[in-house]
Regions:
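Conserved glycine-rich cofactor-binding loop
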Residues: 9, 16-17
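Conserved glycine-rich Rossmann-like NAD(P)H-binding loop of the short-chain dehydrogenase/reductase
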Residues: 30-45
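Conserved NAD(P)H cofactor-binding loop of Rossmann-fold oxidoreductase domains
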Residues: 89-96, 250-251
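Catalytic loop of short-chain dehydrogenase/reductase
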Residues: 92-93, 135-174, 186-187
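Substrate-binding pocket helix/loop in short-chain dehydrogenase/reductase
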Residues: 97-99, 103-111, 207, 211
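C-terminal substrate-recognition "lid" of short-chain dehydrogenase/reductases
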Residues: 128, 219-248, 253
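Short, small/polar-rich loop/turn modules that mediate ligand/substrate recognition or access, typified
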Residues: 173, 178, 241-243
Length: 254
């Protein structure tokens, strides 16, 4: 896909996850210079760099640490002559619990990671994206369209971030910056695989049957189907697309 990738790099936040790592591969395979971040999984980051023959680079980054975010963005911008695209695919194992079961500490931890972390990223990257006339893509959840019980710790923060995405699109369009999101259904990779291995999981046969009943396309999604959508949104083919949330969910939202 022709993006006419401008000077600078594509920055993938959360590049060691199932979707994030596929974004790293997809953008690399389409000629972009890619830098990706990891929070704690250095071994997986090293594997991805080796897999792509050292042609991508990785740095450690904790989005909840504002000073670290500000410093890292500045360094990446300077060392790569700009950042033309930011893909935020960061995420972690979020407990599947009903609202009545969630303690205040867990709630605050998720809010700090997902909402405050995204704000730290957005607030310190907007000026950089103005310079490159760049694009921001946030990996969100199809739960925004059809709420799945027990998923509030994923859906509630992403609903807030979705409004931030719209705000960036509205406020920064005149400065050449676009902002969009991708609402994921069940993607057969990454966090979903880790959740399947947890004890007391929601993901039993009854859950599987209920999800399939809600899908127009009767299968789970693949990580590359998400990364290809991110590629489109970052490309010149989507130059007139901003403030939009694209479901990649097999029709779950219908």
């Amino acid at each position: 896909m022709d993006k006419n990738f401008k000077n600078g790099c594509v920055l993938v936040i959360g590049g060691t996850g199932g979707v994030g790592s596929e974004c790293v591969r997809t953008f690399h395979n389409h000629g972009a210079k890619v830098v990706f971040t990891y929070n704690s999984n250095k071994d997986e980051a090293t594997k991805i760099v080796d897999e792509l023959n050292g042609k991508v680079s990785a740095i450690q980054l904790d989005l909840s640490n504002e000073n670290s975010v500000k410093k890292s963005l500045s360094e990446i911008n300077q060392s790569n002559q700009g950042i033309n695209t930011i893909i935020n695919a960061a995420g972690f194992n979020i407990p599947q619990k009903y609202i009545s079961e969630i303690d205040a500490e867990t709630w605050r931890r998720v809010i700090d990671s997902d909402i405050n972390g995204f704000f730290n990223l957005a607030s310190h990257s907007i000026k950089i994206l103005r310079e490159s006339q760049g694009s921001l893509v946030f990996i969100s959840s199809a739960g925004l369209f059809k709420y799945p019980p027990g998923d509030v710790l994923s859906v509630a923060p992403k609903a807030t971030v979705e409004q931030l995405i719209k705000g960036i699109a509205k406020e920064e369009g005149a400065n050449g910056v676009r902002a969009n999101s991708i609402a994921l259904g069940v993607i057969d990779a990454g966090i979903f695989h880790r959740l399947l291995n947890e004890e007391n999981t929601f993901f039993d046969e009854e859950w599987h049957e209920a999800v399939m009943a809600n899908l127009a396309i009767k299968r789970f999604g693949a990580a590359e189907e998400v990364s290809n959508t991110a590629l489109f949104l970052a490309s010149s083919h989507a130059a007139y697309v901003t403030g939009h949330c694209i479901p990649v969910d097999g029709g779950y939202h219908l």
